Amino acid sequence: MLGTAQAGITLVREILVRPELNLKVVGFLDEKGENIGKSLVNPSIIGSVNQVGDIVKEKGVSRVILSLNERRGCTPVEQLLQLKFSGVQIEDAHSMYEKMTGKILLTNLAPSWLFLSAGFRKSRSLLAAKRCIDIAVSLLGIILGLPLMGVIALAIWVETGLPIFFRQQRVGLGQRPFTIVKFRSMFQDAEAGGASWALKNDPRVTRIGHLLRKFRLDELPQLFNVLRGEMSLVGPRPEQTQLCAMLEKIIPMYWRRHSLRPGITGWAQVRYQYGSTVEETERKLEYDLYYIKNLSLKLDLAIILATFNVILFGRGAK
């Protein structure tokens, strides 16, 4: 690991808990060579970045990962070029972490990495195909799902009365607000005190609401949002306007998730659990950025299939 930035430490921790990767970390190389022997994680700092050529030969290293706190003036360019041309793989910590985990690590992430790395392509043909699929599937889903929606509406009315639907302002494509529609799964006036995150085992949720949420049936009315073009079948989940305003001040690049239509389901929803804190929201953003970077119909299909697993078996992320 060339450098001691937090991104590299996080990557090493991920490698250490995943023996199936068959990767062995030889050690860290410190930027200034002042902390040799210090343990960041197992293994420790074994030299300075200027010794990278000698250490690679001595240890038989096949891959060097860059995780420098400051690259300007600290990168041993000539040595890395020699290693690259001799067959040693040179990678960036963020790129390797992305491939390993299916998310983009926000720690030490420079904006330059985002615009220089491959991805974030949104061709007109891809977006047009995605929109056509949204229209066709949402229209079919509404037609076939009307009887089920009627049963759900009746069950909500019997248990807690009106209203049947829950409407709330959310932030959509280009940070434009829209009104999301869901089957009401909480008691009336559950959010009278203001915007708040959903919680696991939330006491505000009704008995029918627990069942609807378990199988994602409360999301069915969002097919109308998709048909109107406010949402997509797959995309980053839309957040409440009040929470968005707060999160954009706290989390770097949070607003980037609004570069696509929000989705009924998304990569973060099938890969992560509840996000009820700022820290958990950051983790979900890492998955959202991965989805935006790697946008494709193939990835959409994988997410939809994973969502069906949740619907059929009542388990998964929220």
Regions found by a protein language model. Give the residues of each.
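A solvent-exposed beta-alpha-beta segment
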Residues: 1-103
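Membrane-cytosol interface motif
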Residues: 1-13, 24-27, 162-187, 206-207
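Short, glycine-rich, amphipathic interfacial segments at transmembrane boundaries or analogous
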Residues: 33-38, 97-110, 166-204, 265-286
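Glycine-rich flexible loop motifs, especially short His-Gly-Gly/GGXG/HXGH segments used as catalytic or interaction
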Residues: 44, 101-142, 164-168, 197-199, ...
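A hydrophobic, helix-centered structural microdomain
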Residues: 125-190, 225, 297-318
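A short, structured surface patch at a secondary-structure boundary
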Residues: 198-261, 303-311
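C-terminal terminal-structure detector
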Residues: 206, 228, 251-318
